[in-house]
Curated annotation (Swiss-Prot):
Organism in which the protein naturally occurs: Arabidopsis thaliana (Mouse-ear cress)
Traits of the deletion mutant: Decreased fumarate levels, while malate levels increase. Leaves display lower levels of many amino acids during the day, but higher levels at night, consistent with a link between fumarate and amino acid metabolism. Plants are unable to acclimate photosynthesis in response to cold.
MF terms in GO: fumarate hydratase activity
Key words of the record: Cytoplasm, Lyase, Transit peptide
Record-given protein name: Fumarate hydratase 2
Annotated site residue numbers, Important for catalytic activity: E366
Any further remark recorded for this protein: There are 2 substrate-binding sites: the catalytic A site, and the non-catalytic B site that may play a role in the transfer of substrate or product between the active site and the solvent. Alternatively, the B site may bind allosteric effectors.
Compositional bias of kind Basic and acidic residues: 23-45
Length: 499
């Protein structure tokens, strides 16, 4: 035991030494980077701070970079949020010029903000999601970048504050109303331009398959066991309707997403704004985006709660539930090719195994179901975030925005990929479908009206026990003649109500 303890202590010491060396190397690399990068001095209320000269951000962004080193670049604030800030700040400058903002400064802000909206300045937005829950640092990131870029447009240097990030770019605004506003702008833009078109294409493709397969009668399955027949078209019609309803659900959330918090400022009262500012800026955003944004009916709700985002995420969660069911059904129906159900042939897109030659897997279905799992997880995060709106301000805004936008993008992209690389190329294996149909014992259900449930059950059990056909079992039990059986058991007549 003593020897083991000494060995463990020695190993622990070695690990500690390696860690110390690694940290020292990282510090040295950071120091070299510091010396090799030219800096300029920026100031905020905390005093001066060094900022890389090639970056447009200012003091508050730099402090956030130093204070929230969480997750690295992959955890950056989503690009749709950054672009939405560009839209909002451009519109704010436009409206503020009506209320006395120097037109020269206002026009420069609008030009700089347009560059942000177009994604031209993305490299100047380094902050991660994991920051203050109001998104203040990201709002200031936008203010500082736009202020410095506007100063350059006017022929001045970065950091001179000829255009001030607070007094000019953030005029009549608070992080508490700008961040929820860009959350809604980003979500609405992504839903209308990306998600809805993808889901519409998937719905159309599934509906097309439903029509293509409308005459193929197959055995149904409930509880994963044989059931009564239906057509493959009816089965795919169910999938198409699920997607259609999903589209309707997400569309029904948009009226709340179109309501903007801008003009509520710090706690919803509109302090430091002029009367009419909220209505005018919503109208300006609507004109800029060509989407029907309006000012929020109640600014206190718009700042303190994000029920609209939770509702939208809920619709995405429902869509994910539908898509997981659809993808699972399709891959199970395509299982095989020789030892599974094999009713469908799925497109063969790439080799499926590094050890089994010739194996091809339902990869699009697998990718889609993983996306659905992620979206369901995102909805949990959005739900928890939405429930933490204490008093006058929800302080989970960045994680709500990030998770919601992540879900929108994932469902949009995965739906498009699934439609293009799977659904569009699905083929029905008619021979296999027919074989399984006529082997099923559940065709016995059509005998119920003639011989009764108990006799029909006896026929099914006899056929299963002896491995014979239903017809043979019925005749052996003496409940039906051959002609009567052939008249009653017609799968094509079992796919709807009788006359």
């Amino acid at each position: 035991m003593a020897a083991l303890t000494m060995q463990f202590e020695g190993e622990k010491k070695n690990v500690s030494e390696v860690a110390d060396v690694t940290l020292k190397q990282e510090d040295e690399q950071q120091e070299r980077r510091s010396y090799s990068t030219p800096f300029r001095e920026e100031r905020d209320t905390f005093g001066p701070i060094q900022v890389p000269s090639d970056k447009l951000w200012g003091a508050q962004t730099q402090r956030s970079l130093q204070n929230f080193e969480i997750g690295g670049d992959r955890e950056r604030m989503p690009e749709p949020i950054v672009r939405a800030f560009g839209v909002l700040k451009k519109c704010a400058a436009k409206v503020n010029m009506e209320y006395g903002l120097d037109p020269m400064i206002g026009e420069a802000i609008m030009e700089a903000a347009q560059e942000v909206a177009e994604g031209k300045l993305n490299d100047h937005f380094p902050l991660v999601v994991w920051q203050t829950g109001s998104g203040t640092q990201s709002n200031m990131n936008a203010n500082e970048v736009i202020a410095n870029r506007a100063a350059e447009i006017l022929g001045h240097k970065r950091g001179e504050k000829i255009v001030h990030p607070n007094d000019h770019v953030n005029r009549s605004q608070s992080s508490n109303d700008t961040f929820p506003t860009v959350m809604h702008i980003a979500a609405a833009t992504e839903i209308t331009s990306r998600l809805i078109p993808s889901l519409k294409n998937l719905h159309s493709s599934l509906e097309s398959k439903s029509f293509e397969f409308k005459d193929i009668v197959k055995i149904g399955r409930t509880h994963t066991q044989d059931a009564t027949p239906l057509t493959l078209g009816q089965e795919f019609g169910g999938y198409a309707t699920q997607v259609e309803y999903g589209l309707n659900r997400v569309a029904c959330t948009l009226p709340r997403i179109y309501q903007l918090a801008q003009g509520g400022t710090a706690v919803g009262t509109g302090l430091n704004t002029k009367k009419g500012f909220d209505v005018k800026i919503a109208a300006a955003v609507a004109e800029e985006t060509n989407l029907p944004f309006v000012t929020a009916e109640n600014k206190f709700e718009a700042l303190a709660a994000h029920d609209a985002c939770v509702e939208t995420s809920g619709s995405l969660n429902t869509i994910a539930t539908s898509l997981m069911k659809i993808a699972n059904d399709i891959r199970f129906l395509g299982s095989g090719p020789r030892c599974g159900l094999g009713e469908l042939s799925l497109p063969e897109n790439e080799p499926g195994s590094s050890i089994m030659p010739g194996k091809v897997n339902p990869t699009q279905c697998e990718a889609l179901t993983m996306v659905c799992a992620q979206v369901m997880g995102n909805h949990v995060a959005v739900t928890i975030g939405g429930s933490n709106g204490h008093f006058e301000l929800n302080v989970f805004k960045p994680v709500i925005a990030s998770a919601l936008l992540h879900s929108i993008r994932l469902i949009a992209d995965a739906s498009a990929s699934f439609e293009k690389n799977c659904v569009r190329g699905i083929e029905a294996n008619r021979e296999r479908i027919s074989k399984l149909l006529h082997e099923s014992l559940m065709l016995v259900t059509s005998l119920n009206p003639k011989i009764g449930y108990d006799n029909a059950a006896a026929v099914a059990k006899r056929a299963h026990k002896e491995g014979c056909t239903l017809k043979h079992a019925a005749m052996k039990l003496g409940v039906l003649t051959s002609e009567e059986f052939d008249t009653l058991v017609v799968p094509e007549k079992m796919i709807g109500p009788s006359d």
